[in-house]
Amino acid sequence: MKLQLLRNATLKLDYAGTTILIDPDFGSKHSRPSFTGRSPNPMVELPVSTDEILAGVELVIVSHLHADHFDKIAQELVPKHLPLVCQPGDEEKIRSFGFTDVTPLTERLTYEGIRLIRRDGNHGSGPVLEKMGNVIGLTIEADGEPSIYWAGDTILYPPVRETIATSAPDIIITHSCGAEWDDLLIVMDAEQTIEICRIAPEDTRIIATHMEALDHATVSRDDLQDYANAHDIAKHKLLIPSDGEVLHLSAPNA
């Protein structure tokens, strides 16, 4: 498989012969308001053009409708005929944008031999959870490919631990910028990401994303790497890609 981190949560995945676009946010640098007063968002430009991002895309996955996961520009530019998978409850809103092939991921579905399984997520805890709304993660599996657990916009909480324990994924993709809302954590921070490294199977690789793009983040790539080094996490265990970076990963024993 080939995975390209584009920016924040936006990923392009070549997997089992299908090109998948996950959580497209195409907004230009500083095109949206600040969350904290520190900087307009996004804080950086996309590393490649939207034409290049969309080239070859056959399936779109949208975890939830926050602007940094499916912004107005992406809603306009993503071809409306492409099959789009979303969380239950978002399908009618997405159809209102003109998309004609929208499927809510209630439990599991199969697309061209790729198995998608819905996983729970908590976009924060306590009073902030209602403000953030519902989100999903998912596992992605196909014969001959590494299994992926894409946790999505979630903190580390018992269902995430359970997913790791029961599915034993080859790859775990985390959102690790330590973003805060009302001084409460709404995605994983360095400590939680390193805990993921510890509880994951020995051969599982963790890919930390959703970093250095939004002004309510509290953890940079360097911060996370420093924390990993201080806790003796091997470099091959935790990957922290730059925007635009491409990773080539194989299934065990492939």
What do these predicted ranges mean?
Residues I53, C86-E145, D226-N253:
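Metallo-beta-lactamase
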Residues T18-I61, K72-Q75, G126, T154-T166:
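Pre-active-site segment of Zn-dependent metallo-hydrolases
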Residues T18-I20, E58-L59, P83, P146-I148, ...:
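Structural motif
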Residues L5-A16, T110-D170, M188:
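Catalytic core of the metallo-beta-lactamase
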Residues H30-S31, P47-Y111:
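Active-site HxH/HxHxD metal-binding segment of metal-dependent hydrolases
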Residues M1-M43, D222-D226, K235-K237, D243-E245:
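Zn-dependent metallo-beta-lactamase
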